[in-house]
Amino acid sequence: MSKRDYYEVLGVGRDASEREIKKAYKRLAMKFHPDRNPGDKAAEASFKEVKEAYEILTDSDKKAAYDQFGHAGVDPNRGGGGFGGGADFGDVFGDVFGDIFGGGRRGGQRQAARGSDLRYNLELSLEEAVRGLTKELRIPTLATCDLCDGSGAKKGSSPTTCGTCHGQGQVQMRQGFFAVQQACPTCHGRGKIIKDPCGKCHGEGRVEKSKTLSVKIPAGVDTGDRIRLSGEGEAGEFGAPPGDLYVQVTVREHAIFVRDGNNLYCEVPISFSTAALGGEIEVPTLDGKVNLKIPSETQTGRMFRLRGKGVKSVRSHAVGDLLCKVVMETPVNLNDKQKELLREFDNTLTGSSKKHSPKAEGFFDGVKKFFQDLNS
């Protein structure tokens, strides 16, 4: 099946800036992320398609090749279209004009591939994310074979030059007027053949292995943050550089606090008497309890700010605040005496609601005026 246009995949125009491309990628990656769509094969395929498009269009060299030649310009396997034989447009025109003017571009052997990048999804509690910590991570990966040191050849032997391409990694085929170069079918473009493969890695130069890494998580990380560990991905082919490891952070929901950037939010219940008369209550923070003074006549929903009790920014020395929303609790399970006292108290307010409940009085005045206007 033919690939979709990379610009179409990201939903941007061909003149899109790198910033616009990154913005589109972030939105689509969040939409199709496997963690948000568990078991959804279509979403997983879309996520891979979006990631591939992003990697090509944010690499200046690959983007230039793609803009000029399309998918053929960035296909690592050099898969061609109507010209057949696996050639790309660079091969076709280079060889044609080389034959005409003498010399021309000659294909080289395929470079050993860099190791693949790995991703590790790390879930943290809010406390861990705010304070930072060191985590031991067990990572399944492909490691360089220690028996053959990554060569793929049996100890004491070494790869030999391919007899088909004579070490060039490519062979030339003529198709009418065109001279087409393609990867050597014998050595698959490497220019070398392993006649006596290593018994441990079977000629691959890499073996499956798990390794344990000690990773320092900085204080203040949040969901969506990514930590890059250079060179800790899969080993490269036959001595090529390794890939990187990306630790993707997710912070679990907290029972008390809600985080928004560097600020924390929580709801604190207060009694009717404390709201009316004022007082002092204990408020939880990530560093322990602190006292919060509640002024008299406090209404439910009022927000109090405790400066410096939020989260320290992972990118600066700034520290957020803790914002506490007080919620007045209605008394429950009252006995007869308590109910009678409340009735007596309510009777003392009769006829003076505007003085003691200005919001309620204003509300009912508004309702009364609404119906008067409706009937007039």
UniProtKB/Swiss-Prot annotation:
Keywords: Chaperone, Cytoplasm, DNA replication, Metal-binding, Repeat, Stress response, Zinc, Zinc-finger. GO terms for biological process: chaperone cofactor-dependent protein refolding; DNA replication; protein refolding; response to heat. It is found in: Cytoplasm. Residues 5-70 form the J domain. Zn(2+) 2 binds at residues 162, 165, 184, 187. GO terms for cellular component: cytoplasm. PROSITE patterns: DNAJ_1 (PS00636), DNAJ_2 (PS50076), ZF_CR (PS51188). A zinc finger (CR-type) spans 132-210. Binds 2 Zn(2+) ions per monomer. One of its GO terms (molecular function) is unfolded protein binding. Belongs to the DnaJ family. Participates actively in the response to hyperosmotic and heat shock by preventing the aggregation of stress-denatured proteins and by disaggregating proteins, also in an autonomous, DnaK-independent fashion. Unfolded proteins bind initially to DnaJ; upon interaction with the DnaJ-bound protein, DnaK hydrolyzes its bound ATP, resulting in the formation of a stable complex. GrpE releases ADP from DnaK; ATP binding to DnaK triggers the release of the substrate protein, thus completing the reaction cycle. The J domain is necessary and sufficient to stimulate DnaK ATPase activity. Zinc center 1 plays an important role in the autonomous, DnaK-independent chaperone activity of DnaJ. Zinc center 2 is essential for interaction with DnaK and for DnaJ activity. This is Chaperone protein DnaJ. It comes from Shewanella loihica (strain ATCC BAA-1088 / PV-4). The lineage of its organism: Bacteria, Pseudomonadati, Pseudomonadota, Gammaproteobacteria, Alteromonadales. The gene is dnaJ.
